[in-house]
UniProtKB/Swiss-Prot annotation:
It comes from Mus musculus (Mouse). Component of a cullin-RING-based BCR (BTB-CUL3-RBX1) E3 ubiquitin-protein ligase complex that mediates the ubiquitination of target proteins, leading most often to their proteasomal degradation. Residues 206-308 form the BACK domain. The modification Phosphoserine is found at residue 466. This is Kelch-like protein 11. Kelch repeats lie at residues 361-408, 409-454, 456-502, 504-557, 611-662. InterPro entries: BACK, BTB/POZ_dom, Kelch-typ_b-propeller, Kelch_1, SKP1/BTB/POZ_sf.
Amino acid sequence: MAAAVAAAAAAAAAAASFQVLEMESMETAVAGSASLAAEVRGSGTVDFVTGAGISTLVDTGGSDPGPEAEDFECSTHCSELSWRQNEQRRQGLFCDITLCFGGAGGREFRAHRSVLAAATEYFTPLLSGQFSESRSGRVEMRKWSSEPGPEPDTVEAVIEYMYTGRIRVSTGSVHEVLELADRFLLIRLKEFCGEFLKKKLHLSNCVAIHSLAHMYTLSQLALKAADMIRRNFYKVIQDEEFYTLPFHLIRDWLSDLEITVDSEEVLFETVLKWVQRNAEERERYFEELFKLLRLSQMKPTYLTRHVKPERLVANNEVCVKLVAEAVERHALRAENIQSGTLQQPTSQVSLLPRYGQNMDVIMVIGGVSEGGDYLSECVGYFVDEDRWVNLPHIHNHLDGHAVAITESYVYVAGSMEPGFAKTVERYNPNLNTWEHVCSLMTRKHSFGLTEVKGKLYSIGGHGNFSPGFKDVTVYNPELDKWHNLESAPKILRDVKALAIEDRFVYIAARTPVDRDTEDGLKAVITCYDTETRQWQDVESLPLIDNYCFFQMSVVNSNFYQTASCCPKSYSLENEEAVRKIAGQVSDEILESLPPEVLSIEGAAICYYRDDVFIIGGWKNSDDIDKQYRKEAYRYCAERKRWMLLPPMPQPRCRATACHVRIPYRYLHGTQRYPMPQNLMWQKDRIRQMQEIHRHALNMRRVPSSQIEC
């Protein structure tokens, strides 16, 4: 009994002791809270404090009580959560669904159905219980664009994107990422792939990207790729990938009026090549594609010698009939021309060239007209239609400038007008526009400009206050920069150039007999090796074709020395070119040329195939009544005689001319182009100065006339 009482007393004492300790603990906590509240009150902020299982909102002080509740958001929580979930997926923790990619090496990818269903609407119905995939926990992924299916690394990256929202896309993986994004309805990832491909769009991949854009309905990407293909169609059809396109895309391109092509003959050969790549499957499409060709734009000889005998044409009644109609149309046109009957312009679109068809044009650039006015207007002789057309203005006053033709541009540089003597512009035929590029390093005119291996070489020239230049400079279009090379051994003025083997530059020029004066100029012909940078005088230009023969037959005349000549490039080897150098040159090419033409100065000379053109110039250079010319002459190699062409819209001298191929869209109808703003302002300024000068002269004449009276 005593023991029981003692035990009860001990228990009561222990309970009392615990209550005391609990009260002390509470007091300590309250005291701590009061102390912390005092500190907070001093700082003027609000904190949410958690202590010993009791949450207390602490007053911030001041007259207005703080809010009773506030929201808390951890900015990194979502990203950390998605990262942890992805780590769990990679370790196979808590996964409840398996994605089976039969093509990806037979690999299976474990995942969480809740994450996949939240990431994309593709998985929401699939895993909601209505389909067998939800019950079995396996989703079979089949039917991919390629037989093996997407690479395992790409699949892993896209699944990781659904967890984390991050992915790295490369040019090698973008097509598979795009296919997976399209399959899984990952809209933002699909749009990103479209923007990525836009940045990587290039002539070498535009066909493939255009196909991808169509396949996955990326409309903006498809438009941009189509525009690149359309403007470079004549290059695109040289790529083997073009001939892997399906019928409907080939049909769409042949139906396009804007595709840039060199001729309908090329399109006919393109259709044949596409069909022959898989004749068994594609021959049934030939008739439909053949109907899209503009046979009336093909030469009659080509129709009869190449198109008509072709097996696919000869065995098809519809195709045979179309060829016969085109040949008959050509015969009727020739009969009208021979009889002098004016042919009414056709309104039938199928009989006209495609708007994107490249047409042969002799382009005339810059120069001076009557009254000494500089001409910024460019004009072109449209060879097929035997008429002159207007082309865009240049932004400079060009006189004594040089011209050079590259694969994509026409470059003009230099001028006698000091304000434009260093300026370089280039013309883009596909866009029908001029643009400025890096200026020359020296103000000059009457120099040589020619292309070698994609770079422009500027050689020699003449300055307004210099007897001439020996300098050689090179322009790199990729860097848009000029740099100096070693100078020529002598001054070279009035330079005409030919390029051989994409290395050697043959030059006909004049050099001063006395370097200290401009009097006494002698003709010189020399060869420059652009690789060794060595110079060697030669007896003549290589007599390769009519253009070379013509230049050498007039090389010592004032007509040639004051003319501008478009440079020409030849692919033959230099050894063969050297064998064509000769001391004696036949002047047979001049026999049918009117004698008065060779008395012209400041003419523009250029070539088209094996024909030669002489355009503009002036007569009576020493007389007050200088006669500016607008006549143009053409040496027809086929007929071996000179012909007088329709006159230019206005006379001009010291212009340059060159052959260029321009899309028909810029040539049909009557084109009008505005004068550039910088030249408009300068023209107004000159007019004002002339009026001031005229007024000053009138003021001086008044007293003089009064005295005479």
